[in-house]
């Protein structure tokens, strides 16, 4: 095919992906917002409007986001969604926009929990927007440090470490606005060694379908070849680190020749 044909296919594919992503994202946001409004009716108490409630909503969203994000790294079926964001081997503002379509579904968790806690739905939506906007600017190598605020906030430095593929940078710094959650729950690690971005095993492709589904396909393959039910559940539910190490442990056994019985 000519270069023009290839460019045309890439453009068409990107357009289709953009339209589909927008439609799914809009649907999930609408669902989350609607569920928050309805769940708020069942809250045992309602917070008053005002600055204190507004700030509480932001802090509560950030706290729930921390656990949501942490689980996305520690459970492989959630990692299969989130891995899209981490598959970039570059780190800049565009990386912040590299988001999986299916991750929008997880927004129902903070929306629903905050609504049940009595946070006004409009405050919940504002908390989400502030959280999302804050995450955008920390995807940069241009800002090395912001001084004493590094102790409190999630910063470009902390988030660069989060995107690292070296062992010391795996499964750390899950906070969005505040880094204090990581310090409280033992998942904080400062940026020391220069970060190598991407996955521990990069996929080396720009194919959108492969980027979005490669981990799901790997999970299916691992489950299909797993020797025990314990391994099958592990490949789906345990962390990706365990899954990759277990796959490597099983690979030599799968390659060993079957011994023939000795005639006698």
PLM regions with names:
Residues 33-45:
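Membrane-interface helix termini and inter-helical loops of multi-pass transporters
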Residues 23-26, 34, 47, 51, ...:
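A broad "ordered helical/assembly scaffold" signature
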């Amino acid at each position: 095919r000519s270069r023009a044909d290839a460019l045309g296919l890439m453009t068409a594919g990107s357009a289709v992906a953009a339209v589909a992503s927008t439609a799914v994202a809009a649907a999930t946001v609408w669902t989350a917002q609607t569920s928050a409004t309805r769940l708020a009716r069942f809250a045992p108490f309602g917070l008053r409007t005002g600055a204190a409630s507004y700030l509480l909503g932001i802090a509560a969203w950030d706290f729930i986001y921390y656990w949501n994000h942490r689980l996305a790294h520690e459970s492989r079926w959630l990692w299969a969604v989130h891995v899209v964001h981490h598959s970039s081997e570059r780190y800049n503002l565009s990386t912040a926009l590299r988001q999986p379509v299916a991750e929008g579904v997880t927004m129902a968790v903070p929306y629903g929990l905050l609504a049940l806690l009595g946070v006004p739905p409009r405050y919940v939506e504002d908390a989400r927007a502030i959280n999302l906007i804050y995450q955008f600017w920390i995807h940069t190598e241009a800002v090395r440090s912001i001084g004493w605020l590094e102790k409190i906030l999630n910063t470009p430095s902390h988030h660069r470490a989060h995107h690292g593929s070296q062992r010391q940078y795996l499964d750390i710094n899950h906070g969005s606005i505040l880094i204090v959650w990581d310090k409280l729950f033992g998942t904080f690690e400062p940026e020391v060694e220069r970060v190598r971005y991407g996955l521990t095993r990069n996929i080396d492709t720009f194919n959108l379908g492969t980027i979005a589904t490669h981990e799901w396909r790997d999970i299916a393959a691992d489950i299909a070849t797993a020797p025990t039910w314990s391994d099958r559940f592990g490949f789906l539910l345990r962390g990706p680190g365990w899954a990759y190490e277990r796959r490597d442990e099983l690979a030599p056994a799968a390659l060993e020749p079957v011994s023939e019985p000795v005639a006698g």
